[in-house]
């Protein structure tokens, strides 16, 4: 499965647009580690806990996006976009939304 943030694939003409596919992934952040995340963020360091949660959520959202495109018998997903949200005021979770257009290639 080809995944691209662009609307076209160079050298691979699109034969058919199959529709929009979307997915989401929610990852909890360990509250004990979250304390250290805030401490590190305050002093400008990188938070491995948050980066790991974001990476895992993005990977899960991508896998689900590909599964939904496969259900449509797509060869690729174009125009892929990821949105990240931390809906909890306390920062206890991260949500990644993924959307794109499933296509069949010539």
UniProtKB/Swiss-Prot annotation:
It comes from the Bacteria. Pfam families: YbjQ_1. Coiled coil: none annotated. It comes from Pseudomonas putida (strain GB-1). Gene3D superfamilies: Hypothetical protein apc22750. Chain B (3.30.110.70). Belongs to the UPF0145 family. This is UPF0145 protein PputGB1_2909.
């Amino acid at each position: 499965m080809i995944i691209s943030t662009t609307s076209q694939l160079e050298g691979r003409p699109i034969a058919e647009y199959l529709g929009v596919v979307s997915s989401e992934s929610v990852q909890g952040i360990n509250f004990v580690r979250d304390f250290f995340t805030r401490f590190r963020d305050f002093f400008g360091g990188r938070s491995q806990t948050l980066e790991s949660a974001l990476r895992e959520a993005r990977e899960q959202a991508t896998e689900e996006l590909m599964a939904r495109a496969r259900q449509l018998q797509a060869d690729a997903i174009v125009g892929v976009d990821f949105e990240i949200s931390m809906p909890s005021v306390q920062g206890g979770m991260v949500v990644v939304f993924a959307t794109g257009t499933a296509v069949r290639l010539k």
